[in-house]
Amino acid sequence: MCIADITRNAHIYPYMTLEDLALLFIRGIGSRGAVHLVDHFGSAEDVYAAPRSALINDAGLRPELAERIVNGDGMHAAEAEVVYCRKHDIRIISATDAEYPLPLREASDRPHVLFVKGNVDALSMRTLSVVGTREISPSGKDTTNRLVGDLATAIDDLCIVSGMAYGADGAAHRAALAHGATTVGVVASVLPEITPTAHRALAEDILRNGGAIVSELHSQTKQNGALFIARNRIIAALSMGLLVVESPATGGSLSTAEIADSYGRVVMAVPGRMTDSTSFGTNNLIRCGKARLILSASDIIEDLGWVPKSKQQPQIKVTEDDTLTPPQRMILSAFDTASTLDYDELITATGLTMGELAMELMELELKGSIRLLPGKRYERV
């Protein structure tokens, strides 16, 4: 495909138009600004169609930024980005896309666009984010391998999310691969490049085994240290739980744990001996009540409310759950006429907004009332 083949308002993917991507390339807007504008106007197309006065007075943009949108800035760069991504087999997903991960969508500082290489469905599996020090000890590696292995044995559709860095990240990804679980790497580099370069082979193994590599960075991004900090928020938001396997008194994994806590995620930590410097951080998280103590995979399963395979039995529901909210009852009622429904069908059936539906679906999954199937369809349990 050449640039001339791409037009404005064209759906470059089923749920995404060129305008979604173009907002990223407007100087002074970026991902955070794009999220704000789309939330305000309803869609990226509506942002570009908005009059200058609305952009300034209603959305609060500076006049020069409004002018860039009115002039169609970012469109040509977006066209080139589509060509680049198709050349490298990279999927582009906007925050309004049905394939955008539900836990990430509820974060206020979510990326407006994700670039995904590999299996997009991996982002919607039963995910656990695992982080820790880059100087992981042999004991920390063994613990990571044991916990991930036991989880993979006990839980269907397990996906381990981590950051592709040295140390605990690499140990988590490799443990998932060794035990037949899916794993997703979130990188602070422009795809298809992998940092560190020593983990390129690991990335290939992840992709070969049904996982994915994720970045929020378009191909024109200039590398800088702040990108790694920003990457951590994606790791924290992608899962309902975050496990810190080993950390010294300071470090990036503790920052990620803080971010996860701010998102309302379940933060967990593995304790270590009081003389082990690589456990000072995790021990302190537990001591201060900022993380739940993890001694086994069973603790993780219990803290996240997961149901292990051994306890999964067909059940006949006699009465409706009294804890269901009215929107949740509407969602479940929609399955009376169809065995499976996708995101758009549920919006049509319930009249809920995208944000409302995302939150209610997550609650219903946690309650065990519905489950997500391959292909982004839901079924009632």
Whereabouts are the PLM-identified features?
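Short, small/acidic-rich helices and loops at N termini and domain boundaries
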Residues: 5-99, 285, 367-369, 374-381
